[in-house]
A protein has these predicted regions:
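Conserved N-terminal/central alpha/beta ligand/cofactor-binding core
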Residues: 19, 26, 31-129, 133, ...
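Flavin (FAD/FMN)-binding glycine-rich loop and adjacent Rossmann-like elements that form
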Residues: 39, 127-128, 140, 147-160, ...
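Nucleotide donor/acceptor-binding cores
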Residues: 2, 25, 159
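A short, glycine/Asx- and small/polar-enriched loop/turn
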Residues: 135-142
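N-terminal Rossmann-fold NAD(P) dinucleotide-binding loop
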Residues: 13
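Beta1/beta-strand and adjacent pyrophosphate-binding region of the FAD-binding site
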Residues: 1-10
Length: 538
């Protein structure tokens, strides 16, 4: 029997395992992918972080991860002195945030972090397995059945089961009460929720990212994708031009904006408002010795796929959606290589080369798609817009302060276009807390969400889904499972009984160095988010 079984090897799963191990409880990670880390590694998405991340607003273990990434570059790359000596080294100088790094580096660093705990037998990892069933007895899960790509199955018995998958795989097989898609205003009372009925199909777009480099004077054009003709002229009704193009819909105003691959000059803020610099994860200018090329991650607005929702249909629908998302990315690459207007005149960038070394794949595409939302538990407490949204909290100067806080985070409610045909929704939010009640399912006693499956709504998921918050949620979940085992209590009892809650929060703050409340900071408005505008000082 395994004490803590973590289904999913993403950031939340890694953080959960690390927390449980640090508290002395052995655990098992069941990872569908051979790379652990999820969005930061196998999905090839560099960190989406808030403006204060270098000072506060993350757990000590997440800060340690960030430091180790920077140390990896200092130890292994020929950095110029100015870059090497910068405490807040940003390997890629990407506009997305202060730490844009290569996906494979994140994976290696995470492996290094877990290595001593694996050596001690406190963490075990099974790779290439996915939840396929569960044995539920009463209000407890006794075991999960996992299956690999060859159809081989095995049963895993445990005390606590954590769902750290993007889609909520454990929630499905264990029949945990959950929600998909967008809730209605009648259900949640949220200011920006749907005014009509709830829409399970209203699921955010997924993105199949890829890594790219430039090899001047070479021809790297990929074979013409089978679906290229379809995607070449594809234009949703709310988009300002064909998706295979340089016009995008502004994430806040929905006005048309020109976003080419490259620009010759920066804008008035000093940043290049182009695609190449958006998620650049390695900047050649920071390397000695004539480094051949930058490396950038293509995970751009025009690459969002939402035609078929991943959830609510059948297995064939999901498989088709994933295949189409990958084909859409290939089509965008082919368009850039052959037909795209160039910043220096002419058409096509044949010198664009997929960089599989960064993603661990032969074609340069990420190992896994970036999935923004999946199943969310029906929780004892659900975080709604009125807890964190600026417009939804008139006259208040911060987010809701939760008695049962188990961590903190910050991001705007950033919703990408959805499968129901809705455009982006981007809402100001206050730096927020993670309530323990959002980690407790309404029925099952030994299932804990360890990431995006927590008790949020369609709206608040848009803020709680990002890297440092997923890490913090997973860390709290792993600590909760360990605490309940050692204290012979349950998650619900831990929350409901004041002395138990205070004891658990003391474990979080003293043994794991997790902040439970924010200092006072301003709201995350369009001028206070990393992206393509300068961030204002706090």
């Amino acid at each position: 029997m395994k004490r803590v079984v973590i289904v999913g090897g993403g950031l939340g799963g890694v953080a959960a395992a690390l927390a449980a191990a640090r508290l002395g409880v052995p655990c098992l990670i069941i990872s569908e992918c051979d790379w652990i880390g999820g969005q930061i590694s196998s999905q090839a998405i560099p960190p989406d972080e808030h403006p204060w991340i270098e000072m506060t607003g993350s757990t000590a273990s997440y800060r340690s991860f960030r430091k180790r990434v920077r140390d990896f570059y200092r130890s292994n790359y020929p950095l110029i002195a100015a870059a090497r000596n910068k405490e807040a080294l940003n390997p890629g100088l990407g506009n997305i945030g202060p730490l844009a790094h290569e996906p494979f580096v994140a994976e290696m660093v995470l492996e290094q972090i877990l290595a001593p705990w694996r050596s001690r037998g406190l963490i075990e990892i099974l790779r290439g397995w996915k939840a396929a069933g569960a044995d539920v007895q009463g209000d407890r899960v006794r075991s999960v059945t996992i299956r690999n790509s060859e159809g081989v199955e095995q049963e895993i018995v445990g005390d606590y089961f954590l769902d750290a998958t993007d889609l909520g795989d454990l929630l499905e097989v264990a029949e945990v009460e959950h929600v998909i898609g967008a809730e209605s205003q009648a259900q949640t009372g949220e200011l920006h929720a749907l005014q009509g009925p709830a829409d399970p199909r209203d699921q955010q777009a997924i993105t199949w990212a890829m890594a790219l480099r430039l090899s001047p004077h070479t021809d790297n054009v990929i074979p013409r994708p089978a679906q290229y003709d379809r995607w070449r002229t594809y234009q949703p009704h709310f988009w300002p031009g064909p998706m295979l193009g340089w016009q995008v819909s502004d994430y806040v105003t929905h006005e048309s904006r020109y976003r080419p691959l490259m620009l010759n000059e920066p804008d008035s803020s000093g940043l290049f408002y182009d695609l190449w610099h958006a998620r650049r994860v390695l900047a050649a200018e920071q390397m000695e010795g004539g480094w051949e090329s930058d490396t950038t991650i293509a995970a751009w607005p025009m690459m969002d796929y939402w035609e078929i929702p991943l959830l609510g249909g059948n297995t064939n629908d999901t498989a088709k959606a994933l295949q189409e998302a990958k084909e859409f990315t290939r089509s965008f690459l082919y368009w850039m290589q052959t037909e795209a207007p160039r910043h220096d005149g002419g058409t096509g960038y044949p010198e664009l080369r997929p960089h599989g070394e960064a993603t661990g794949t032969p074609d340069g595409l990420a190992k896994m798609p970036y999935i923004r939302e999946g199943r969310r538990i029906q929780a004892d407490f659900t975080v709604v817009e009125e807890h964190i949204g600026v417009a939804a909290r008139p006259g208040k100067a911060g987010a809701e302060r939760f008695r049962d806080s188990v961590g903190i985070g910050a991001y705007r409610m950033d919703l990408h276009p959805s499968s129901s045909g809705r455009n982006t929704l981007d809402l100001d939010s206050w730096p927020f807390e993670i309530p323990l009640g959002a980690l407790i399912p309404v029925r099952l006693n030994n299932v804990i969400p360890a990431g995006k499956t927590m008790g949020t709504t369609h709206l608040t998921n848009g803020a709680y889904r990002v890297h440092p918050v997923e890490w913090a949620t997973g860390e709290a979940a792993g600590a909760l499972a360990a605490y309940c085992l050692q204290s012979k209590t349950t998650p619900r009892e831990t929350r409901d009984q004041d002395f138990q809650l205070e004891d658990f929060q003391s474990v979080l703050s003293t043994r794991l160095d997790i902040d439970l409340h924010w200092p006072e900071f301003g709201a995350l408005t369009p001028l206070r988010r990393f992206g393509y505008v300068q961030t204002a000082a706090s």
